[in-house]
């Protein structure tokens, strides 16, 4: 009987441990918080493999999913690091982007993009984004990746990259037209 109880207790402990470590949802900070306006710091390459950094990546992925977002940048969870995650099934697979650089391919022009921001509740704004970009970064294994992006992937990457430089979508909209711009867009993607 004691052995049975012990096994049960061990099982219960294991389940609690697994569930508490599997995902931690982080607090998403809102406009007005100074971290959103700071220029985020480069991630030291040797630290990418650190368990704490890998946990931060996992926590950001689960926080993004829980919030119904398609992208989330580290400054939005009050970590001033040059890192973001993005995912929008089926067009954008889960991507972890560390220390990115963007080359805006201006020849392909810009297009309107209606966006919501997880750090600006209730405001969907119409901004302009480049149609095509070249994104270079390190993935979560520390490997260097260099890709051309268009479509929704390019939009999310530009939004998240702005977060690393303290730029929010409210900055990209002319003050005079902002009121008009966020009326009527109810289902904009959150990022
Ligand atoms: Zn945002």
Regions found by a protein language model. Name each.
Residues 8-16:
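Sec-dependent N-terminal signal peptides
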Residues 1-9:
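Bacterial N-terminal signal peptides that target proteins for export
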Residues 19-191:
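Positively charged
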């Amino acid at each position: 009987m004691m052995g049975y109880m012990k096994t049960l207790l061990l099982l219960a402990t294991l389940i609690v441990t697994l569930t508490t470590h599997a995902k931690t949802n982080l607090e998403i900070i809102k406009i007005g918080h100074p971290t959103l306006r700071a220029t985020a710091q480069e991630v030291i390459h040797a630290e990418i493999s650190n368990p704490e950094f890998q946990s931060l990546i996992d926590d950001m992925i689960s926080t993004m999913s829980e919030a119904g977002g398609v992208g989330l940048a580290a400054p939005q969870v009050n970590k001033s690091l040059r890192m973001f995650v993005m995912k929008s099934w089926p067009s954008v697979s889960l991507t972890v982007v560390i220390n990115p650089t963007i080359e805006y391919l201006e020849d392909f022009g810009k297009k309107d993009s209606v966006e919501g921001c997880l750090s600006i509740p209730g405001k969907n704004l119409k901004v302009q984004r480049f149609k095509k970009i070249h994104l270079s970064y390190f993935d979560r294994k520390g490997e260097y990746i260099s890709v051309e992006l268009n479509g929704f992937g390019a939009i999310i990457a530009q939004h998240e990259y702005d977060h690393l430089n303290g730029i929010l979508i409210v900055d990209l909209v002319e003050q005079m037209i902002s009121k008009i711009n966020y009326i009527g867009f109810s289902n904009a993607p959150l990022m």
